[in-house]
Amino acid sequence: MSKKRLNEIARELGVSSKEVVAKAQELGFEVKSHASSVDEASAKRLAESFGGQKSEATKVAAKVSKPEKVDETPKVETAKVEKAKETQPVVKEEVAASAVQSASHRPQSRNFKAEREARAKEQAAKRAQNQGKGGQAKSDQDRRDNRQLGQGRSNNERNDRRDNRRDQRPEERKDNRFGDRRDNRDNRRQDNRSGRLARFEQREAAKPAGPKIDFKARAAALKAEQNAEYARTSEERFRQAQEAKKQPKKPKEIKFEEPVVESKPFVKPALVASVPEQVAETTVDTRRKKQARPDKKRDFNSDEEDGPRKQQRNRNSQNQVRNQRTSNWNNNKKNKKGKANQPAKPVTERKFHELPTEFEYTAGMTVAEIAKRIKREPAEIVKKLFLMGVMATQNQSLDGDTIELLMVDYGIEAKEKVEVDNADIERFFVEEGYLNEEEMTERPPVVTIMGHVDHGKTTLLDTLRNSRVATGEAGGITQHIGAYQIEEAGKKITFLDTPGHAAFTSMRARGASVTDLTILVVAADDGVMPQTIEAINHSKAANVPIIVAINKIDKPGANPERVIGELAEHGVISTAWGGESEFVEISAKFNQNIDELLETVLLVAEIQELKADPTVRAIGTVIEAHLDKGKGAVATLLVQQGTLNVQDPIVVGNTFGRVRAMTNDLGRRVKTAGPSTPVSITGLNETPMAGDHFAVYEDEKSARAAGEERAKRALLKQRQATQRVSLENLFDTLKAGEVKSVNVIIKADVQGSVEALASSLQKIEVEGVRVNIVHSAVGAINESDITLAEASNALVIGFNVRPTAEARSQAEADDVEVRLHSIIYKVIEEMEDAMKGMLDPEYEEKIIGEAIIRETFKVSKVGTIGGFMVVRGKVTRDSSVRVIRDGVVVFDGKLASLKRYKDDVKEVGNAQEGGLMIENYNDLKVDDTIEAYIMEEIKK
C-alpha cells in the first residue's frame, strides 16, 4: 500500500503544511512534521476534512488566474491596433485555460510571468493607439505627472503604509508566511511550467499544416553556398591582407569616455490640432529589472541596526565586517562598469629579432640561457628539443652535442667557447706561448743519482759536495730526496739523490720525471739488483739518457765486465759495445775518476742543448715537503722555468701562499732562484705533496682563488673515489667486511717518507687482515693525533719524529700505543707480527670418548637422564656430545650435567658407568651412541 507525505497532501489541497499537520494530529494520526507519511485511507480521510476549504481555494485560484480587464479608450484604429485587439482575447483564453487545467490537479497560485506578459502587451497596444492622434504626447504627459506626484510623497508616508499593511495581515498568515513560502514557490514553478506547455500545444494546434521542410538539406545547401563564396573571395582577401601588412600601422587613438547624454528625439506635431512640443523619453523595459531613478532617495531608518543613518557618527568604525562586505560589493560593481567603459589598450607588437650568425656556447648551458642569447622564447626551444627527441625544461642543462644540433636546426654556426681554467697549473707546462723563444738561455742540467741500496749513491754525492751526508742518515740509507748544486769548470750541475729501498718507488719515479739525465750507480761486486732494474725502467719511461757509474772498483771482488754484460741484458748498452750509454768506473769512497764522471755529465748535457726562459713567472716541481715546528710548511722546490722571487704569490699542488723566505742547498738565504735551482721555501698554508707542480701567479687574489679551487676539486675527487661502488668491486666490498683491519696513523718528518711508509704497510700480505691508514701527515705527533687514535682505535707510528710532551701524557692517559721508528725495515716487520696476532684462531675437532646408553630415566621438571657406559676414551663435563642413532647424528650439543652415582664429576673414564643430561634434548633412547669431542686450537 503506497503512502503519501503530508506536504504532498497540502499541495493537492492548496493549504499550508502546518494546517495539514495540525489537522492530522487532531484526527489522531501519528505524525511529527510535514515530511511524515500516511497511507491512502488516512490521506483520503484527511482530504475529506479539508473538503470545504479545497473548493473555496479552487475558486480563489481561478479568480486570481484571470487577468484584470484593462480600460481602453476608443481611438483612431489602425491595422496594427486591430491586430493587437484580435490577439488579446486569444492570450486571455490561453491563460485562463492553463489556469483551469492546472487547478484541477494541483493548488492554483498566481502566474506572475503570465501577468507581466499580459500587462506588457496591453501597454504596447495603448502606445500603438496613441501614436496616431498625438496620444503619445498625452501618455508621456501622464507619466510625467505621475512621476512628479510620486516625488512628492515622502519616505515617511511610504514607511507608514508598509507598516499598516504588515499590521493588517491576519495572524495565521503572519505565522505561516515563512513556513509556506517554500511550498508556494514550488507551486508557482509547477503552474508556470504547465501554463507554458499548454500555450505551446495550443499554438502548435492552431498553426495550419504546411509542407514539411527538410532543415538538414537546407543547412547543407547554405553551407555549400558559403564555402563557394569564401573560395571566390579568398584570393582577394589574401591580397588585401598582404597590402595591409606592408602599410605602416597608425597608432590607435585613445578615445576618452564622454558623458552619456540622454537623446531627445523630435516628435512631429499632429495634423488635427497643434500640440505643444514635448520631449519624448526613451521607452524603458520594466519587465526584467526595476530601473533606479537618480532623484529618488531611499531611507531605511527602521531597518538600521545602529539607528537612523543620519544620526550615526563614525559609522565606518562601528561595524567593520559590514563595511568591508559593502565596500567589496561596491568595488566589484565599479570594476564591472569600469571594464565596460574603459577604452581598449593598444596591443604592442613583439619586436622581431634576427637570429645571430654565430653562437659561442659552453657545455652545460640551460635552455633559458640559450633562448636569451638567440632572442627566442624558451618554449620554442623546448618544442624543438622535443621534436628532436630530447625532453628538457627551460632550467635544464644541455650538453655540447645537443646545443650544436639545436643550432643546426636554427641555421646558426655553433662554436664551443674555450675557457681558461685559472686553477689549472699544468697548462703552464704545455702552453707553447708561455715561453719566449728569444729569451731562451742555457741552464744547468738536473742529474738524478739512482741505484740499489748500499751501492754508494749518497757516498758519491758526498764526495761531489765534499760533505758527510751519509753519516746523518738513519741506518746509513737515504730515506728522502736530497737536492744539491755544485760547480764544475765554471758550470753548475744540480744533483738529486733518491732512495734505493723498494719502499721509495714513487720517489724514484718522481726524481726521474724532473731530471735531464740519470747516473745509475751499480756496485761492481753486487752487479744488477732489483732496484737497479727499476731505476732503468723509470729512466726509459721518462726518456732520459743514462750514465752508468760502476762503483766500488777498489774492492777485491769487483767485476766491471760482468756488470756491463748484465746491464746489456736490460737494454743499457755501453758506447764501447755500440750503444748510447756512457760507462764510467769510479770509486766514490776513494775519489777515483770523479772528475771524469762530471765531464761526461757536462758533455751529455751540452749535446741535449738544455735551455730555459728566466723572464717568465716561475714554474717547477716539489722535490720534498715537510712540516717544521717553527717555520710551518717547508717545501723543497726545483725551478724548471722562470725565476722565483721572495714575496711571489704561488700555488703549490692543492695549497697556496706567498714565498716568505727562500734558502738554497747550503742553508743560505737567497732572494731569487733561476732555472734548475733547488730551493726550500716557507709561507705555504699547508704541506704539499712531493711531486706536485707549482706556479707563480700575478697577484695573491688569483693565487688564493686557484688554490682553493684545486683543494675543492681534490676533496670532491677523494669523496667520489671512496663512495663509488660498481658491480665489479661489489663482491670485494662485501668481502672486506669480513676481513679484520688494523687502523694506523702515520706521522713522518718528510712527505716522501709518509708516502713510502703508507705504501709499504698496505702491501703487507697477511690473509684475513689489512692495514687501514686513518691519517697520515708530516710533523711531530700532537694531541689531535692521540685523540683521533683513541676515537678510531688506531696505532700511532712515528717515523723520524717524536711526540710532544702533551701528546705523550695524553697517550698514557688514554692508553694509546705510540711506536717510534727511524728504520723502515723494523716498521714493516713489527706490523707483520701484529697483524698475524689479530687473526682469529683456527680450531680442529678431536674425539675424546664414546659411550652407549644402557637405560633412560624420565624425571618430572628435570628431563631425561641417560645411564651410560664408556666404551672408549672418556667423557668430560666441558666436552660437546653427539647423539648417534643407527649411524645417523640426531643431535649435537653440550652436556647439562655429568654424574657418577650421585656425585657430580668432571669426567667419566673408560669402562665406567655414569649418568648424563644433554641441554635442550630429552629424546634419549637405549642403545644410542654418545660421542664426546672437544675443539683444539691450531698453532700457526
Curated annotation (Swiss-Prot):
Region named G5:
587-589
Listed GO CC annotations: cytosol
Give the start-end ranges of region G3: 497-500
* Location(s), subcellular: Cytoplasm
Q: Where does GTP bind?
A: 451-458, 497-501, 551-554
Region ranges (Disordered): 48-264, 278-351
- Ranges of compositional bias, category Low complexity: 314-332
What are the alphabetically sorted keywords of the record? Cytoplasm, GTP-binding, Initiation factor, Nucleotide-binding, Protein biosynthesis
Please report the stretch or stretches of sequence annotated as the tr-type G domain: 442-609
Where in this protein does the record put region G2?
A: 476-480
Biased composition, class Basic and acidic residues, residue ranges: 65-95, 112-125, 155-206, 232-258, 292-301
Region of interest called G1, as start-end residue ranges on this chain:
451-458
Recorded coiled-coil stretches: none
Disulphide connectivity of cysteines: none
Alphabetically, the GO molecular function entries are: GTP binding; GTPase activity; translation initiation factor activity
Q: What is its main location?
A: cytoplasm
PROSITE patterns reported in the protein's UniProt record: G_TR_2, IF2
Record-stated family: Belongs to the TRAFAC class translation factor GTPase superfamily. Classic translation factor GTPase family. IF-2 subfamily.
Q: What does this protein do?
A: One of the essential components for the initiation of protein synthesis. Protects formylmethionyl-tRNA from spontaneous hydrolysis and promotes its binding to the 30S ribosomal subunits. Also involved in the hydrolysis of GTP during the formation of the 70S ribosomal complex.
Question: What name has this protein been given in UniProt?
Answer: Translation initiation factor IF-2
Q: What is the protein's species of origin?
A: Streptococcus suis (strain 05ZYH33)
